[in-house]
């Protein structure tokens, strides 16, 4: 009995001695660069193997005294090495396969699509970056980028009136202190006053990954005090891929209440002024307006609908990659809120507001990449993001009330042509360039608000109807030149210089009309209760309406920038220093200037923006970082225009001189 126990213990000890973990790295024998995605297989046990990570490393469990590793990667010669069990870490060099073949382009998969790849991008990044992979986005229930981004570290979102996430707040700083990129290129905003981009216009399913940068380097645009949000759109896969998704749901809020809607299809897109100009007597009548869009309905909404379609493939011996994707989202949202007014203001007490909102989003993008050869690549991206929202806001307090019927349409178009070129041995010299055309547009035609006193429409100032639209057009070019210098001892210098130029043009239009009610009492012929059928109210417009508003302007902005940056890498240390210079030329022209305001204005300024970053690799999965960067916050176009807003919930005035 004792001999059996001893035999079992000896067997367990023997197994424990034989089992172990071998760690290693696979590098290019000529350049010393780590090879990502190389295959490592145990020759004696072909079923046991792994692939190298983003830093070229691998871990492999073995249970032999001696074994042979077979290492291979496309474009390199297969390499076999015998390893003893007591050797815990090795470095394996792969030599380039110089056999002459017909030209073949090898396309690797995007590592950022997986969680492991996203974490690798974060570790290898020069600055502080958080990445959400396509896999994580697919698993989340969020249908817009605005809701996806709130799941990232150090990021919160600002919601709109219907409760939907809309703008990103980075590091606790207001939305104006960050900017938005698509595939590394800044895009314009459809907002009529500000620069920030609403992230709810982007369907999340069109993303390859989402990056949030919290510290700027010199090769990034300098107006991001809070950071930058970069949307990397789906790229062509390595093999044919076709996906379809369809989902539905229902907003539980409408189990207990009806959805308020209005006939937004009857809205006339152009105001009377846009249709016929200024009349001779400076007056308009109700014949110049339609009231069909003021008819409201109360019913149960249809279920939400989400649909998506994408197709990707590679052609011409993998030289040409194509990714086509489309998305459709139709959702019904609602919210109940309270607005508190300070004593002594226009309103007193609390205003209770109920929101009903139908949001329709359409997204389409096409991304093509062409590999001329192993050293030269062209990419052409075209994207169209569209959002339409029909919203009813029903507000009231103890005495007064107001109902607003608003339809808003926004879209962003972006077309970017990029080139990536490598020169010299091992691609030591690299040149990247981009040519960009973008447009953002927003329109809110016939935004109607009707004011009530109890069950009656106010006689004076019974309603306001306004037309607004604006567009933002960008033409931009980017150029980056990078050179890698490897020294004896393993240290590496990376030198970068580059610049960008952007020409932005913005136009904004605003036209508002005030109406009185022809009668202040409820007429029995009007249907419904509490003046719900607003299209039957007898309104009378006051004179012509207001077009002398600061929101009627044309503006231009020209930005030129250049930078220089150097990165030094030695063992676990990485130092990055750079400086960026940006010159800004802004100007505006008021279309209908009022008295005591400047009809034109211009300003020019230059900013010098240094940055310095240090990274120390404590562990393969952990880094210590220090970052310093100087950045700016440019005023929006509306902020340099002398303006005064008196028809919102509060009064606002700016730049009187």
PLM region spans:
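Surface-exposed extracellular loop regions of Gram-negative outer-membrane beta-barrel proteins
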Residues: 186, 388, 441-447, 505-507, ...
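Short acidic/polar hinge/loop motifs at secondary-structure boundaries
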Residues: 59-61, 157, 185-214, 259-261
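Short, acidic Ser/Thr/Gly-rich low-complexity loop/linker segments typical of extracellular
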Residues: 46-57, 83
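A beta-strand signature from Gram-negative outer-membrane beta-barrel systems
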Residues: 92, 201-245
